[in-house]
Amino acid sequence: MSKDAPVAEGRTHQFTTRSGADTIDVGRKLAGLLKPPQLLLLRGELGTGKTTLVKGIAQALDAAEPEEVTSPTFTLIHEYDGTREGKAVKLFHIDVYRLESERQLETLGLDELLTPDSIVLVEWGDKFKSIRKRATGEIVISSEGGDARKITVTLKE
């Protein structure tokens, strides 16, 4: 499978945003589509709004307010406790940009994070075959010029 090929074939949803606030709003809407367990790739160039989207998802899950959600580039994993439909849910936001090998990836303990009540969002996960194979979908964010973004979400059936 090509790094650029879609990970999942199934339900596809597209959104266009014009600002960071719009991207957060889309994240809030997406939270309703994400049923645990999920492992989703977050794909997009630097600065396209991957973490901004996660802010909305975390807020909708009552896991964190947007200002509390930051990029996990240096810490690798941020964990948030939330709820979905009255049930506890764990939201993991992972950034593997700085990892260079599958061996380094193994030290994150991804298997332990993938539980029946977890939603795992992985930035730059398309770098690793093991993550691409296990992904249940992907979110692709592309710049449309200025602050405009196209967000394409594909979830496996």
Language model: regions and residue ranges:
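N-terminal pre-Walker A segment at the start of P-loop NTPase domains
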Residues: 2-29
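AAA+/P-loop NTPase substrate/partner-engagement loops
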Residues: 69-92
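Post-Walker A helix-loop "phosphate-sensing" segment adjacent to the P-loop in P-loop NTPases
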Residues: 59-68, 82
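Hydrophobic anchor at the beta1->P-loop junction of P-loop NTPases
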Residues: 40-42
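Phosphate-binding P-loop
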Residues: 31-37
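Short phosphate-coordinating micro-motif centered on Lys-Gly-acidic
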Residues: 2-6, 13, 100-157
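Conserved lysine of the Walker
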Residues: 50
